[in-house]
A protein has these predicted regions:
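A generic structural signal for alpha->beta connector loops
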Residues: 1, 30, 90, 116-118
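Conserved SAM-binding motif I beta-strand of class I
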Residues: 3-8
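S-adenosyl-L-methionine
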Residues: 10-53
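A short linear-motif detector with a strong N-terminal bias
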Residues: 12-15, 73, 120-124
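Surface-exposed loop/turn and secondary-structure junction residues enriched for glycine/proline
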Residues: 29, 65, 132-134
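Glycine-rich loops and low-complexity Gly/Arg-rich segments
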Residues: 29-32, 57-59, 79-82, 118-121
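S-adenosylmethionine
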Residues: 37-113
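C-terminal catalytic and target-recognition region of SAM-dependent MTase-like enzymes
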Residues: 92-148
């Protein structure tokens, strides 16, 4: 990638991302760390017809400003229609599933079903040894690719 943007509403998390870049020997350019509501950022990207090679979605279990836990899921039904069209054909979407109310398969079906562009499951993963042994309690990760 020629550039990466990290969009985060919480200042503390954005500072943590910058520090992680430093710790990994990566250049830190403040223009790549955007403190903004992701929903607004994605809507603006759509207006500018921005196209990207990859997106990492790691939404919190509780969405700021809405003040309440969402129905089962992490608001992928709203986020995916905003971000999937921004992917170039062949681009990837990496999703982190934190909440336990649903299975991995249900989350993956939600992502594919919410997308206005064709997505296919590319890869699945889980968290490491520092998470519980129960597969449903682990952090579940899935990568999708835009096929058309």
């Amino acid at each position: 990638a020629r550039w990466v943007s990290h969009v985060e509403l919480q200042k503390r998390q954005l500072l943590r991302a910058k520090e992680n870049h430093r710790l990994n020997g990566l250049a830190v350019d403040d223009r790549n760390f955007v403190r903004e509501d992701l929903y607004k950022h994605l809507r603006r990207a759509a207006k500018r017809d921005v196209e990207v090679d990859g997106i990492i979605l790691d939404p919190p279990p509780m969405v700021p400003k809405r003040g309440a836990h969402l129905p089962p899921g992490q608001d992928y039904s709203t986020l995916v229609p905003l971000c999937a069209p921004r992917l170039a054909v062949g681009g990837w979407l990496l999703c982190f599933f934190h909440r336990r109310e649903r299975t991995r398969e249900e989350y993956e079906a939600e992502v594919v079903g919410a997308s206005p562009v064709p997505l296919e499951l590319l890869w699945q993963g889980t968290s490491g040894l520092d998470f519980p042994d129960d597969p449903q309690a682990k952090l579940r990760i899935a990568a999708f690719t835009r096929t058309g």
